[in-house]
């Protein structure tokens, strides 16, 4: 008799996705981040659900309700800090996952890649709205500054901003709708993840060599389930060290001051994972130009399949492209640092140079270097 897992309509889907899935035999630890992102999403949804049970989305009580969670709810501090630092772990895994895709040419899976970019945008939107909820100083001013960027859109800009605010400034209506969206979006993310996996399983996974691996596949279970469990344990270990020893390491002290529309903090800055985009936004003096650069800094990822001019898929055997890739990584780290610095000399010029370099490497240098490598290999 055939095994139930292979015949049952529901279990069959799980079987084909996580058990009997044919997987390349040579995928490295860089392929662990997909499952780690799934784990992060599960942690965020669970901790978020328990936080939502005690949180109130009203300007008068939001800050107090978060304090109440930390002080009076059983293990509320643990849930709150796991949720806050879980977001940081989520973004670390996201950046490494995207970087892996760029390095090994996974973007040639067109649909999977584009859905991944959409996922990145939705996760960024969710994280931004979550940061507004504690209603501290940085929450309020962050929301004001970022939503105000939409006013750069010609003609309809200001109307659009006031429509999003639900009034003439960031207030109760804004907080309530942000909470509603912050609650619903993770479930939309989960649905998108399923579509992401659906398209991935149409083609099968890429591998470090970038070569077709149909002739050498192994079952996902037990080989990669055990590998994923190791990754998961390491992720939980790092997250717990962060939560239990220095929960506020990545946060902003200003957010422990209740929101006050009458006093602006000296330096308004978003969470660390948005700083690279924030630096690009600030490096252009023109408001609309800055907003366009900000949007394009993420959407540029969608151009990767079109900018791939190399005859090889992966960068594994392309030393020149590897050099440019790591310069790009260093550039992004520089942008992240600049995003957290005040707007003054020499930070302004460093930010502008790093922003120019970011777009130049992706749009010009990487494709050119690919063509040079083709020539060197007489392809």
Swiss-Prot record:
Pfam family for this entry, one: Cytochrom_B_C
Residues bound to heme b b562: 83, 182
Alphabetically ordered keywords of this record: Electron transport, Heme, Iron, Membrane, Metal-binding, Mitochondrion, Mitochondrion inner membrane, Respiratory chain, Transmembrane, Transmembrane helix, Transport, Ubiquinone
GO cellular component, one term: respiratory chain complex III
Compartments (UniProt record): Mitochondrion inner membrane
CDD domains membership: cytochrome_b_C, Cytochrome_b_N
Cofactor note: Binds 2 heme b groups non-covalently.
Extra information: Heme 1 (or BL or b562) is low-potential and absorbs at about 562 nm, and heme 2 (or BH or b566) is high-potential and absorbs at about 566 nm.
Subunit comment: The cytochrome bc1 complex contains 11 subunits: 3 respiratory subunits (MT-CYB, CYC1 and UQCRFS1), 2 core proteins (UQCRC1 and UQCRC2) and 6 low-molecular weight proteins (UQCRH/QCR6, UQCRB/QCR7, UQCRQ/QCR8, UQCR10/QCR9, UQCR11/QCR10 and a cleavage product of UQCRFS1). This cytochrome bc1 complex then forms a dimer.
Function: Component of the ubiquinol-cytochrome c reductase complex (complex III or cytochrome b-c1 complex) that is part of the mitochondrial respiratory chain. The b-c1 complex mediates electron transfer from ubiquinol to cytochrome c. Contributes to the generation of a proton gradient across the mitochondrial membrane that is then used for ATP synthesis.
Protein name as it appears in the record: Cytochrome b
Phylogenetic classification of the source organism: Eukaryota, Metazoa, Chordata, Craniata, Vertebrata
């Amino acid at each position: 008799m055939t095994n139930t897992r292979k015949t049952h309509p529901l279990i069959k889907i799980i079987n084909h996705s996580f058990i009997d899935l044919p997987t390349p035999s040579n995928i490295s630890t860089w392929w662990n981040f997909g499952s780690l992102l799934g784990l992060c999403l599960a942690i965020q949804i669970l901790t978020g659900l328990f936080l939502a049970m005690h949180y109130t989305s009203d300007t008068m009580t939001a800050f107090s309700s978060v304090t109440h969670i930390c002080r009076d709810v059983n293990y509320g501090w643990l849930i709150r800090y796991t949720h806050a630092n879980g977001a940081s772990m989520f973004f670390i895994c996201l950046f490494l996952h995207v970087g892996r895709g760029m390095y090994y040419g996974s973007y040639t899976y067109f649909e999977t890649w584009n859905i991944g970019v959409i996922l990145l945008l939705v996760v960024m939107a969710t994280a931004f709205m979550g940061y507004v909820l504690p209603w501290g100083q940085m929450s309020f001013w962050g929301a004001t500054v970022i939503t105000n960027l939409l006013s750069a859109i010609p003609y309809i800009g200001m109307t659009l901003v006031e429509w999003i605010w639900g009034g003439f400034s960031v207030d109760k209506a804004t907080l309530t709708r942000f909470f509603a969206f912050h609650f619903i979006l993770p479930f939309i993310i989960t649905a998108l993840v399923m579509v992401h996996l659906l398209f991935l399983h149409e083609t099968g996974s890429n591998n470090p060599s970038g070569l077709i691996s149909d002739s050498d596949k192994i079952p996902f279970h037990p080989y990669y389930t055990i590998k994923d469990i190791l990754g998961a344990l390491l992720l939980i270990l790092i997250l717990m060290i962060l939560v239990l020893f220095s929960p506020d390491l990545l946060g902003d002290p200003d957010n422990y001051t209740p929101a006050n529309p009458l006093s602006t903090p000296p330096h308004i800055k978003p969470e660390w994972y948005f700083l690279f985009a924030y630096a690009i936004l600030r490096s252009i003096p023109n408001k609309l130009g800055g907003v366009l650069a900000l949007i394009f800094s993420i959407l540029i990822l969608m151009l990767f399949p079109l900018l791939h001019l190399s005859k090889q898929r992966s960068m594994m055997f392309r030393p020149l492209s590897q050099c440019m890739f790591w310069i790009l990584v260093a550039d992004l780290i520089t942008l992240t640092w600049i995003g957290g610095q005040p707007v003054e000399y020499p930070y302004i010029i460093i930010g502008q140079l790093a922003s120019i370099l970011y777009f130049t490497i992706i749009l010009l240098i990487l494709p050119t270097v690919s063509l040079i490598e083709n020539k060197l290999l007489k392809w």
